[in-house]
């Protein structure tokens, strides 16, 4: 597979800069290897490079169970599912990647992000307790990713978001699960992580704003 071709098509995907960088890592690894022997994997890779995540997930699912022990195939499946908004399946796929490759920081990242998205989805029918469990799991996975890649600012930023969301969940006045102490602790930890991000780039106005907002949320707890 031509690396220039891969790079050109990757730039056409409608992804954020951070997620694009994560995708390049895995897809480039595939590109540098011989063409995969499984036709469904090849079709999945092509669909992914074309930005067709739904087709990519369909082809990669068909590659299982034959490729169920290949963390790269499972990663691409989870990545496709994530960008389809199928966060439950994505979290499951990334869990399988982690079981095969416990040092895969990107898998921890996407599993955490998928669970965070599930926890805060407006249409969610999950109980408050289930949402709290998802956010706690998300925080734990970001922490594991940080243990692998301690200097990745994105991991601290996203863990801060998970802490903030946990603070909102626990700190909503009148809610059955209201817990001022837990909410305060979550906001404080979010602030610490946001401030860690600023040590990498002190000029980031968005993070400065998030620090201020987290402090306001914390200080307004009743």
Regions of interest found by a model, annotated:
Residues 49-50, 83-84, 117-124, 165-168, ...:
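Register position in tetratricopeptide repeats
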């Amino acid at each position: 597979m031509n690396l220039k071709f891969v790079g050109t098509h990757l730039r056409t995907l409608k992804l954020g800069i951070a997620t694009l960088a994560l995708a390049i890592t895995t897809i480039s690894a595939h590109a540098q290897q011989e063409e995969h022997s499984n036709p469904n994997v090849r079709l999945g890779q092509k669909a992914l490079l074309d930005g067709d995540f739904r087709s990519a997930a369909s082809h990669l699912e068909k590659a299982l169970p034959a490729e169920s022990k290949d963390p790269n195939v499972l990663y691409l499946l989870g990545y496709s599912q994530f960008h389809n908004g199928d966060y439950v399946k994505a979290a499951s796929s990334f869990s399988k990647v982690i079981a095969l490759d416990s040092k895969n920081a990107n898998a921890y990242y996407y599993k955490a992000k998928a669970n965070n998205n599930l926890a805060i989805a407006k249409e969610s029918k999950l109980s408050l307790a289930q949402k709290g469990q998802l956010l706690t799991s998300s925080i734990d996975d970001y922490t594991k990713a940080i243990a692998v890649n301690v200097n990745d600012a994105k991991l601290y930023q996203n863990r801060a978001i998970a802490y903030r969301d946990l603070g909102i969940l626990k700190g909503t006045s009148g809610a059955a699960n209201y817990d001022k102490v837990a909410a305060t602790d979550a906001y404080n930890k979010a602030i610490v992580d946001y401030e860690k991000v600023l040590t990498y780039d002190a000029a980031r106005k968005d993070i400065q704003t998030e620090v201020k907002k987290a402090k306001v949320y914390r200080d307004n707890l009743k």
